[in-house]
UniProtKB/Swiss-Prot annotation:
One of the Pfam families matching this protein, by short name: Glyco_transf_8
E.C. number(s) listed in UniProt: 2.4.1.-
Official protein name in the record: Glycosyltransferase 8 domain-containing protein 1
Coiled coil: none
GO cellular component: Golgi apparatus; membrane
Keywords (A to Z) from UniProt: Glycoprotein, Glycosyltransferase, Membrane, Signal-anchor, Transferase, Transmembrane, Transmembrane helix
Signal peptide feature range: none
Gene Ontology MF, one: UDP-glycosyltransferase activity
Enzyme class at the top of the EC tree: transferase
Cytoplasmic membrane side: 1-7
Compartments, record wording: Membrane
Transmembrane segments: 8-28
Lumenal side of membrane: 29-371
Amino acid sequence: MSFRKVNIIILVLAVALFLLVLHHNFLSLSSLLRNEVTDSGIVGPQPIDFVPNALRHAVDGRQEEIPVVIAASEDRLGGAIAAINSIQHNTRSNVIFYIVTLNNTADHLRSWLNSDSLKSIRYKIVNFDPKLLEGKVKEDPDQGESMKPLTFARFYLPILVPSAKKAIYMDDDVIVQGDILALYNTALKPGHAAAFSEDCDSASTKVVIRGAGNQYNYIGYLDYKKERIRKLSMKASTCSFNPGVFVANLTEWKRQNITNQLEKWMKLNVEEGLYSRTLAGSITTPPLLIVFYQQHSTIDPMWNVRHLGSSAGKRYSPQFVKAAKLLHWNGHLKPWGRTASYTDVWEKWYIPDPTGKFNLIRRYTEISNIK
């Protein structure tokens, strides 16, 4: 065998060995990326970061991931933190939090999530672009809080969680006392893109709004004097549902173009004013009621025990509150504010802001009075 042939053989073997090592390293890297669940391919609202190295408390790698979407605005950040903390401590499931916020809140949120008490949490911070709402929302000073951009994040779930087939959305004014896996396993009927808790269920008493009648049916949210609403042939007495907590089948959501349907009714409301003038609930409710009319499944009412923020009085017994799977302080009185019912239950899950920017108003007031 000539010297030239020997060199060629050695070169071929060297190249083969190099490719073998490269292939092995590539497989290892791919496995690592899968295990750490990194993802930067979201179109629309952009992921700011993801923390893959969080310690997991005995999570089986074969478990299905449970995406939980929650909006976190700067002035309500403590609420989102308490909600996340309560979910994490009451489950052993593989939960990933998609925390939707605005750019100016991301750093504050990130520093809070780096607290020792929250280091086991797996999360992704997703920036919501308010430009998505241009031409779809009109300014209304009477709506105040519900007009903020993040209120509408729930309409864009397939964009926020692009790779998931199913997800949970919940507001920031909740505390979870049950295992979130049970809510995630809610059975949705064929063709249904979401499951909500209806306002006529037995767990939540009916709310009477001054000037609006009973705020638990469609007529409380939509203006039935408008021809476009009447043409939909929706019964005004139909029980409404609460959009603050729901389970979404994202495959079905995409198939039915739910986001596009919701945007259509948002635009029509800007042009024609289709929502009830006595609307007391969230401004996100009317378009959801239209799109999901007789086309939604239901969740266990104990997974959305609400109206805790409607008054300072305790409308539920301590025993009932303890048995609830999820407590919801919807209404004007928030558990981080001056007064609300069962603030002690909420405060159990609250973690103080390490930056000192967010304070419980009642505590701050008490300290000021002492001084």
